Amino acid sequence: MDEQKRLLLAVLLSVVVLVGYQFFFTTPPADRNLPQNTQKAPDQARQPATGDNQSTVSDYNRADQGLPAPSPQPSTADFRTISVSTPLYNIAISEYLAAVTSQSLKKYKSSNGSSTDLKQMVDPRLSRGTLITGTQGGTIQGLDNAVFTADTDTTNLTLAQGEKAVAFSWTSPHGITVKKIYRFQADSYLIDCDIVIQNGSGMPLNDALVITTPGIFDEETKKRSRFAFQGPVAYIGNEYLTIKPKDIEDQDTFTGQVDWTGYTDRYFLTAVLPQKSGDAHLKLQYENEIAESRLVWRMDRLDPEKQGEYAFVYYMGPKSHKVLSQYD
């Protein structure tokens, strides 16, 4: 896929600029130990849900889809956590916000001195997790505290080969349905995520999606960041950006062609990659020792009985030339 290839190449080039050497807490596995299927050509990967020249909006009819009328939402205490285990990682997604609350990398160790603890990509102090979806204008009432429902009866899934999809859905009190469809690949750190908005209300919806990747930036992180950058990162307008949290007060918005946004520590990266070009920008926030990188993606106007589909790719893995080059 040319578009995905271009985006991933941008990630790779920016990592090469940032990291001039590869050093991990444990010796990375040799190339021969990496899954061979990761060498597949990009055009063999799953195609985006919509093409660059196609509208993201289509007809949607509640009656045709057999969807029930909106019902009272469950308490935020009534939710499950869906775990998926692949050869590369263990990931946990909560039905609360349909956000990623944990991801441990099986091939990398933690920096806490333990020889057994795996690298954890989501700091446990991030109570809402990461890759959180919201709207800029708050027009989908309740989304910021939503409890989704996953389309699986079991909470523990194993993926040894191929790919597996898990869909999370939620309907607002006004009849707007939000779906987050995660697609995991056994041999890749890439996770496809399609976000579908179905307007079952009686009013048009005109807003922007916001996907947030937060990170802890406390005094200890500040000390480590003196030697290798940690914090919000992005690739915008063919330029690799590293934004120090202390500078966010001076500039919290970056515009231009957004290839990806995310958050990095010294050796690992969490990134959001749109699968097509669109009206987007980066919005940053830093407070209470949490720095947030937010991809703001303008949605097409959704009239009643219309739906919009927006395709993204998430990357949660090593900031390694060796690994990222497999996705060129």
Where do the protein language model's features map onto the residues?
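Membrane-protein biogenesis/insertion across secretory and organellar systems
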Residues: 1-328
